[in-house]
Design a protein with these regions (language model features):
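N-terminal secretory signal peptides that target proteins for export/translocation
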Residues: 1-6
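Bacterial N-terminal signal peptides
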Residues: 9-23
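Low-complexity, acidic/polar, glycine-enriched regions of mature
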Residues: 24-198
């Protein structure tokens, strides 16, 4: 088959264009990194309120990351937590009280973790504030409800640190109340994390 000079030039142009794009695709594919679940930490802080709150405790809850990915090239992030794996870490309570708090947290009155075992976050928009700082908007699925959340993130020494404020009622969870409402859990909880990418 005889190739004209014009056709040959077009083929050469196409080859050059594809060659120019290949490094971009390669960089894009390589920018996605898995979250190191062994070295990453996600903590939920739950606070008390009410008339006799001085006699109650704030709660610290560990939420092990099951899996997740970070992609600075595409400005995306997502992770999954198994709700059944959440653990109450409160150091100032007895083992018996800690077990009771955990049973309440995982049970049908709060997280209902057997019915809703997955907690998932997926970013929808990432805005760069300055070098190593971002505001991340995304969808959080918790207790079978998906709601938009905003997360402030900072990268330092290879670690991504951040926090967000959530309202339990936004996810269909009624804050725990005891002693006729004289001691109760605040609707607002704070989520803190430190992620390390592999």
């Amino acid at each position: 088959m005889r190739i004209t000079a014009k056709a040959g030039a077009m083929m050469l142009f196409c080859l050059l264009a594809v060659s120019a794009l290949l490094p971009v695709w390669a960089a894009d594919a390589g920018s996605q990194k898995a979250i190191d679940t062994e070295r990453s930490v996600l903590t939920v802080r739950v606070y008390k309120t009410g008339l006799f709150s001085a006699f109650a405790h704030d709660h610290e809850i560990g939420a092990p990351i099951q899996k997740g990915v970070l992609d600075e090239g595409k400005s995306t992030a997502e992770f999954v937590v198994d709700a059944r794996a959440l653990r109450v870490l409160d150091p100032d309570v007895s083992d018996k009280d800690r077990a009771e708090i955990q049973a309440t947290m995982l049970g049908p009155k709060v997280l209902d973790s057997e019915k809703f075992p997955e907690i998932r976050f997926h970013s929808t928009e990432v805005n760069r504030i300055s070098e190593g700082k971002w505001t991340v908007h995304g969808d959080l699925t918790l207790h079978g409800q998906t709601r938009p959340v905003k997360v402030d993130v900072e990268r330092k020494n290879g670690r991504y640190r951040g926090s967000a404020q959530l309202l339990q009622k936004d996810f269909g969870i009624t804050p725990v109340t005891i002693a006729g409402g004289t001691v109760k859990v605040k609707d607002e909880v704070r989520v803190e994390f430190e992620f390390v990418a592999r």
